[in-house]
């Protein structure tokens, strides 16, 4: 397969153009990664609907950005680290806090536990040991939170994999390395 490039507005179908128009309106541009997903309007529309639905879940915007940073670090996705570092800062995280989250070294016990759960799920193909899960419950999370966290991991892993498959240009300021 040839190198995948970021499609222009004219290269995607009408269903994808609807999503392009939406992002242009809310963000001023269509991020390169979402544009690339737009080669398949089905993939783009189903992904954006899935992520938008997660805004109604356990984790508010700031928490979701923290989760996205952890997942992207563990999956080695430079694009998503860049875009979600920018989003995390807009949602109240400092630069230092984003680095701590990514390294699993947040001073907040809740975030240490979330990091361990995410790391276990990613490294063990969905499994997490009893001790890890007991820690998740001990910081106040329930079954609904576990399902929401799993959904966020899956959604972010999708975009992480798209970037790692395509290596499209990163159109956000690069995240600081750990």
Region locations from a protein language model:
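Hydrophobic alpha-helical segments
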Residues: 1-178
């Amino acid at each position: 397969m040839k190198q995948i490039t970021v499609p222009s507005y004219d290269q995607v179908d009408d269903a994808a153009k609807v999503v392009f128009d939406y992002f242009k309106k809310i963000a001023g541009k269509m991020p390169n990664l979402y544009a690339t997903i737009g080669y398949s309007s089905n993939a783009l529309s189903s992904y954006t609907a899935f992520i938008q639905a997660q805004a109604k879940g356990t984790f508010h915007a700031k928490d979701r950005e923290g989760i996205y940073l952890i997942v992207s670090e563990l999956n080695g996705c430079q694009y998503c680290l860049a875009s979600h570092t920018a989003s995390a800062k807009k949602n109240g995280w400092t630069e230092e806090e984003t680095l701590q989250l990514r390294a699993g070294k947040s001073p907040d016990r809740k975030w240490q536990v979330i990091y361990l759960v995410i790391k276990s799920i990613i490294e063990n193909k969905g499994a997490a040991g009893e001790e890890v899960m007991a820690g998740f419950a001990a910081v106040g999370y329930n079954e609904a939170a576990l399902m929401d966290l799993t959904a966020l991991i899956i959604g972010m892993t999708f975009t992480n994999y798209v970037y790692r498959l395509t290596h499209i240009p990163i159109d956000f300021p690069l995240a600081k390395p750990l």
